[in-house]
């Protein structure tokens, strides 16, 4: 059984240190409060409700270990380089609006280098309030933070001041090659990433439901089975195909762009196409929607040259150059989320990690697909992959975070949030960060599972938190973007 890594938590006490009528909030013990951030210059006064705060326990504070509940999702700023989400390398990042219902996390993103030019020596946490709802995961490139709130907004990472916002509605966004690429559905446009100036805009033959950008190429998926590739600098159409899968036209299940290759699921086959020309490199049979149990095919190109695929209850290890099948693993239940890959030998925790919808976590040998161990958790409906970092595997199921030792497969701890966990956890510098539908951001000690700090916002957390250069960025349904010290929450540095 998993020991409980944290105490039962309830709503935090009233904000401390703010005079009546002041909309700033302060964590108990913090030197300075967080203000509401710069407001939109539209002449309207938006009421800002102070958030509640809960003091993080002292490191030495003992906590009772509770049994698991039966089934019912960095250093200081300017410190060591932060790795990408799920321990991946840096690169361009993407965020896409939900199609309806609960705001899900956006597609997997990877972080740019954390060095922020021009950051002042004395940095303060901040928050920025939007007029409209936020969705997805924030994106940081150089000294700007990009978020979508009906438009694309670019905020200065040091001060929280808005640099620019788009005049067009943007349901999806990708930042790459010095440009912000976005779509309002029937059209696609690009802006300068620094100044927001329009570079090009064009009409698309279909409704864009997914958008990714990399190495000068923009890849879109349109409703009705269309896939298009565009020149990032000019908007010229590079190639287009029809007949892609139409059962799962959602941002997370759309065509995937990775390292110069476009991966498309069509006619029961997984196609690997040259991203610039559309020429087929290889194809591999994975089955249509009925054959894979009514679940989308999930693809994870990996650093070892393989492409790992979850198709129904199967996990496939394919050769990245030829598409030849290296191995196949079958489980009793279907996989809803992509595989996760950790580089290195299995004896050091390397391999492929997957979790099925029953909540069983599998550690597979990347060379032959043999399962080294399997650990049951809770039934999960999350589309987010497990997270592997620093020899530990973190997986969310419902309102709980489970952490497992990657090598032996032994249960380390279970931490329960107040409601369903949103997005995926982020593990950086010995800490695990995640958001929840209980309106809270949580930061735990990654090894012990004890609560480092917790922030209650005015709404559900949306998407996956982002950690760059020791700063944690997150969005909430209270229409605020938060920039917090990853180690201390609202602690002051400088």
Model-inferred region functions:
Residues 5-11, 15, 42, 61, ...:
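Compositionally biased regions
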Residues 65, 98, 447-464:
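Short cationic/low-complexity microdomains
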Residues 3-18, 27, 34-35, 40, ...:
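Extended, low-complexity, intrinsically disordered tandem-repeat tracts enriched
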